[in-house]
Amino acid sequence: MALNLKALLGMLFVFIGCCSNVVFLELIIQIDPGAGNLITFAQFLFIALEGLVFTSKFFTVRPKIALKDYVILVALFFGANVCNNYAFNFNIPMPLHMIFRSGSLMANMIMGIVLLKKRYNLRQYSSVAMITAGIILCTLVSSGDVKDNTHHSLKVDTSYSDFFWWTVGIGLLTIALLVTAYMGIYQEVIYKKYGKHPSEALFFTHMLPLPGFLIMAGNIVQHFGIAWSSEPVAVPLLGAIGLEWKFPLMLFYLLCNVVTQYVCISAVYVLTTECASLTVTLVVTLRKFVSLLFSIIYFRNPFTLNHWVGTILVFFGTILFANVINQVRDAYRARSSRKTHFDTAPLAKKVE
């Protein structure tokens, strides 16, 4: 399949933006694991402001998609993001978080069967079984090494065990997975009705939920205080005269996380309009795998043989679901067929 320059750049920025975003996310949660709401709010605010200026042009551009459809989409998108980021406050390690979110195909299949009455073949059921088994294995292995990750300034005495809060985190990830799957189905319905408008969708799905963060204002302010009081890092302003500016390290990581999140999600939106769903699935899955490896190696996260088995099941289950082997084989055969045709064409002319 030939890819245009826009699609290739989209793939490149998915890896640059999304992989670096995960790095800065992990750097933040190492300082303050409960900063999920702060991170989500900062990401939504930045992307909404960018869209207000460049996409909506301060609401002077008429939206192509009805606002009532955006409201439903936004409620799903907001809920999924809050659950995913808030899960870090419940003893969920980064590798498990990434592996669990890789179960999106499984969730999509469940939603497809329940809501759209879809039927799937044996290969698809087998692949989802592999993905499910991989996630369950990694989850069970991680449950044996649960520890309290709450920031020291927020610790409270409680009779509940760390394991209980870990199960709450798993519950949040499960809800986020199912909500994201339903959101994908609803998004597909909207795009069929109105056409694809990625920049507009990106703006409205981040602008409309902003009032919802008022519910979490206390939590956001609390963790912003932790970020503000984090270890300062020297930022050179005028190197020639040696002028430096002290900036809180966690706020620096947060700024980098917000910018890379914008690059990441913008690139994914571009891919959805330029490539087939198979290509998007493969790129996103490979990106998650690269991020996982980096998290294990660079941040020295605990990763046992069972974790590797679970990861391999998830990764190859995704490849099987996307039917990559058959797609590559068919593409190779088509290419060989065209080459054979061109090679024999001159001989045919000579015979004539």
From Swiss-Prot:
Chief localisation class: endoplasmic reticulum
GO terms for biological process, alphabetical: GDP-fucose import into endoplasmic reticulum lumen; GDP-fucose transmembrane transport; UDP-N-acetylglucosamine transmembrane transport; UDP-xylose transmembrane transport
GO molecular function, one term: UDP-N-acetylglucosamine transmembrane transporter activity
Protein name, as recorded: Endoplasmic reticulum GDP-fucose transporter
Membrane topology: Multi-pass membrane protein
Function: Sugar transporter that specifically mediates the transport of UDP-N-acetylglucosamine (UDP-GlcNAc), GDP-fucose and UDP-xylose. Functions redundantly with Gfr in the O-fucosylation of Notch, positively regulating Notch signaling. Involved in the biosynthesis of heparan sulfate-glycosaminoglycan (HS-GAG) and in Dpp signaling in the wing imaginal disk.
Source species: Drosophila melanogaster
Ranges that cross the membrane: 9-29, 34-54, 70-90, 96-116, 126-146, 163-183, 201-221, 249-271, 276-298, 305-325
GO cellular component: endoplasmic reticulum membrane; Golgi membrane
Family classification: Belongs to the nucleotide-sugar transporter family. SLC35B subfamily.
Subcellular localization(s) per the UniProt record: Endoplasmic reticulum membrane
Disruption phenotype: Homozygous lethal. In a weak loss-of-function phenotype, a gap in the fifth longitudinal vein of the adult wing is observed.
Motif (Prevents secretion from ER): 350-352
InterPro entries xrefs: SCL35B1-4/HUT1
Annotated Pfam families: UAA
